[in-house]
Amino acid sequence: MKYPTEYNGCFAACPDPIDFRAFTTVNIYEDKNAYYYDGDFKKLARPGHRDYLGQISATVEQMNKKELALGTKTRSGQQFDIWEAVYSPVGKDGYPQPIWDKKTGVIDHKVAAYWKENYDLAYILKRDWAKNGENWKGRIHIYCGDMDNFYLNNAVYLAEEMLEGLANPPYDGVVDYGDRAEHCWNGDHTQPNYITRLRYHRMFIPKWAELV
């Protein structure tokens, strides 16, 4: 996306959040707190990990506080800290600026605005489509289980809706979902996920070869 003339498309399976309005279960632009849903009468913990039946094994708060116990200042080596290390601007202390307070979950919307302009792929696609659409047309292929363990399908839904609305040119790509498939579903509707996720290259290389 940042080098549209140098790469011949993407084949993304279970992509990390590609629309930050659904950063797993958090909208980093509109939500105030990453750990709880707002409500008039109660606060409800945001789920962070589930199985294909929707059984929740961890909340966003629990996952983040585990990271905090492993290392402060984005140094745990775990998933939320990894995203923060990539997306965030450098703070005055030399470490990535937190997208939210690890202890309370309060979101820093100034950091969110930086993420949006630099790493929110769905937003950048829409923003730059008039300039780069001809390079991106027909080259975007996204596959995701509709029961992704980390709710990554939520961002794919939003990105798909945006892509379908593009014109001049139309995006002419592929977005496909695996029914009840968990993390790392890659587009194969014929085999169980635990098999197909091990042969991803055998699936996407023939499709890629058609483009080149």
Regions found by a protein language model. Give the residues of each.
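Non-catalytic cap/lid and distal C-terminal segments of serine-dependent acyl enzymes
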Residues: 1-212
